[in-house]
């Protein structure tokens, strides 16, 4: 009896020690995963990081889950190895083999897969998207600027890796008109019932049969979902020419000013309706430059110019506004000249950072950044160098 009791005590002690050891290992693993996330995936707007450490049913330490960034997964494994814990690796990276193109003039992307979800951004027709998850009604996608959100499956058309490669090599045109245009069923149609769709600045289409054909001044085009139609050829530019542009502040400001009076829309990223950072994105994209999505992200790019030095700003520089005590950026504008800028606040309009100007706004001006000369630095990408748009060797 005494021997049995002693054995039970020893077994309980061993189990307790094992449980304690597992708990310690789990704590180390949780800390390691958190450290990796802090280092490589702090911005959930751009990186999916659904990796967690846990004990399985047998009490074994497991680290599993998905991330959209291979560097984040490598960081997790490195942190775990540095912590000296033994674990089963069930982590994985979303593959780069599922793609989509936006099929409507402006698709709304939301923070969750529901129409009641907050609108995070938009993509215009022909925008290439990396597909992370497919549901029956919502797809989780990543836009070329890295932004991750959910888009209705009805707003996109899916492509395989080979189909996406073929699209990148196809004869494509981009809408460079600042104003909305109509696509008609025939080259001579003008009636309201003859409209296939509208297109906005930045929409990308292909040519029917792979060869540009113009009839009655209209280009015969194919939309991402296979629909065809005709639109005024003068509104299109071959995508290679658009992407080859040099920095042109006049082009950027022309697009921005063409939207004057356009209503503000949170998450709006098209000429239909637009928010402050969307105005910067759309205007720069017209010049072939892809900016980050949000003002707080854009504020960390380019060359910084202090607010007190606003007189040294040049046309096309971005101005950032927000909380003077915390430095938190909440608004962005595009600088023109002599303190004047264009921005979206309620509507697209003009104001000034010059305290002596009648159009001066009291919202604290924090700093500016210069995009010119900083292309291909973090957060600023020329479309011609983006592998989703072109085959980049």
Stretches found by the model and what they are:
Residues 4, 8-9, 13, 19-127, ...:
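N-terminal targeting leaders
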Residues 60-62, 66, 73, 120-152, ...:
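SH3/SH3-like beta-barrel superfamily modules
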Residues 186-188, 194-199, 212-218, 261-274, ...:
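Glycine-rich catalytic cores of cysteine/serine-nucleophile enzymes that process amide/ester linkages
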């Amino acid at each position: 009896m005494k021997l049995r009791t002693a054995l039970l005590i020893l077994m309980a002690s061993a189990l307790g020690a094992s449980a304690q050891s597992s708990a310690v290992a789990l704590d180390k693993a949780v800390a390691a995963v958190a450290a990796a996330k802090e280092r490589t995936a702090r911005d959930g707007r751009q990186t999916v990081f659904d990796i967690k450490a846990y004990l399985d049913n047998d009490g074994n330490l497991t680290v599993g889950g998905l991330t959209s960034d291979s560097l984040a997964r490598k960081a997790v494994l490195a942190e775990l190895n540095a912590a000296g814990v033994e674990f089963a690796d069930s982590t994985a990276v979303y593959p780069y083999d599922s793609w989509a193109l936006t099929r409507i003039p402006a698709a709304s992307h939301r923070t969750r897969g529901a129409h009641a979800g907050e609108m995070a951004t938009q993509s215009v027709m022909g925008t290439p998207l990396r597909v992370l998850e497919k549901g029956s009604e919502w797809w989780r996608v990543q836009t070329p600027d890295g932004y991750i959100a959910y888009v209705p499956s009805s707003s996109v058309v899916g492509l395989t890796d080979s189909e996406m490669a073929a699209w990148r090599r196809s004869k494509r045109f981009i809408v460079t008109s600042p104003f909305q245009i109509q696509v008609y069923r025939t080259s001579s149609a003008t009636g309201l019932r003859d409209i296939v769709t509208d297109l906005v600045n930045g929409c990308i289409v292909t040519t029917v049969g792979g060869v540009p054909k113009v009839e009655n001044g209209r280009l015969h085009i194919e939309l991402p979902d296979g629909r065809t139609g005709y639109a005024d050829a003068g509104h299109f530019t071959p995508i290679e020419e658009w992407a080859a542009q040099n920095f042109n502040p006049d082009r950027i400001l022309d697009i921005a000013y063409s939207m004057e009076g356009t209503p503000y829309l949170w998450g709006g990223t098209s000429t239909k309706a637009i928010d402050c950072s969307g105005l910067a994105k759309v205007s720069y994209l017209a010049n072939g430059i892809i900016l980050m999505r949000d003002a707080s992200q854009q504020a960390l790019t380019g060359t910084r110019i202090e607010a007190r030095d606003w007189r040294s700003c040049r046309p096309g520089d971005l101005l950032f506004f927000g909380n003077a005590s915390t430095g938190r950026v909440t608004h962005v504008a595009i600088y023109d000249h002599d303190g004047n800028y264009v921005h979206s606040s309620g509507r697209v309009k003009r104001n000034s950072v010059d305290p002596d100007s009648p159009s001066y706004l009291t919202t604290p001006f924090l700093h500016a950044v210069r995009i010119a000369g900083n292309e291909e630095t973090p957060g600023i990408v020329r479309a011609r160098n983006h592998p989703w748009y072109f085959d980049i060797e």
